[in-house]
Amino acid sequence: MTPGDRARTSSEVADALADGRAVVALETAVLTHGVPRDARPRPTTLDPDHEAGRILGDHEWDASAPFNLETVRAIAAGCRRSGAVPAVVGMLDGVLRIGLDDAELERLAVDSSARKLSTRDLGLAAIDGANGGTTVAATMRACRLAAPRTIEVFATGGIGGVHRGWQQRPDVSADLRALATEPVAVVAAGAKVILDVAATLEALDSLGVPVVGFGTDAMPLFTAGVHSELRVPHRVDDASSVASLLRSHWHDLGIASGVLVANPCPEDAAIDST
C-alpha cells in the first residue's frame, strides 16, 4: 500500500484546495470520545439568540440523532455558513480520511470501538484497519497530508497541553509537539481548563509557537471564558490580521511551526471554571 492509500482527501475538499478556496479542518476525537452518543435536544447555547447559534445559522438540529453526530454536523454547518469547506478528519478501515461525508461521519459516530488517535497511533491503526477519531495532533498531521495542497487552518474546541501535577508526572500532550512542528493555524478556545494553563503557555513559548488572542489580551480557558490573570503574548482583532501573521510566519520567514489562534468561548456560553 502506498502513502497515498493511507490518507485520502475527499473530492469536495480536493476541489476546494485546487481552486484556492477556504478549507477548515475539523477533528473527530470530539465525535468518538468527547461528547455523548445518545440522542439529545439542541443545547440552549446553540439557539439563534446566542452568539454560537447565530454562527450556525439555519442548521436544523436533529434531536433524534446521536448527540455526538449532531455536534459535528453543527460545527461543519458553521464552517459552511462562514464561507469555508469543512474537512472533517477521521480514520475508517485504516485509511485517514480528510473530508468525511455524512454517511462516514455517522458510521464513526456510532462505532463504540473507535479508537482515539494521536500521531503515535496512526501507523498502527492503519495497519490494523481500524476506525478512529483524530486528536488535535493527528488532525494537524492530516492537514499536511491533504492533496493537492495542504490545509492551513484547523478549528477545534481546545488544545491539550501540560497537565496539572507535571512536576511529579510529566504528562504533556502530543498536541504541543504538533504545534511546534506542523505549520497549521489552530483556532481554538485556548487550552482545556483541566490543564496547567500557565505551564502550557510556557511550553508553547519554549517550542517557538506563536500564541495570539483573537479579540482578547487574556488566555481563553476552553469552555470557561478567559483567564483574567494570564495574558497572551500577542493580540489580533480581525481575520485579515491573522492572515498577515500566517503569511509572514510561514511564507516570508519560512518558520515551520504552527500558530495558536486563541479565540474565547462566547460569554453567553461560558461556564464557571471553579
Residue ranges and their predicted role:
Residues 6, 10, 40, 64-75, ...:
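Generic structural signal for well-ordered, non-membrane alpha-helical segments
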Residues 21-35, 156, 161:
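Amphipathic alpha-helical packing elements
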Residues 28, 33-35, 39-65, 69-125, ...:
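Glycine-rich nucleotide/cofactor/substrate-binding loop typically near the N-terminus or early
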Residues 23, 86-98, 176-274:
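A structural signal for small-residue-enriched, beta-sheet-centric alpha/beta enzyme cores
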Residues 1-20:
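N- or domain-start disorder-to-order transition segments that initiate the globular core
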Residues 42-43, 104-107, 172-173, 228-233:
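Short, hinge-like loop/turn segments at secondary-structure boundaries
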Residues 94-183:
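Divalent-metal (Mg2+/Mn2+/Ca2+)-assisted nucleotide/phosphate chemistry catalytic cores
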Residues 14-18, 22-24, 81, 142-148, ...:
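Solvent-exposed alpha-helices and their adjacent loops that cap or buttress functional pockets
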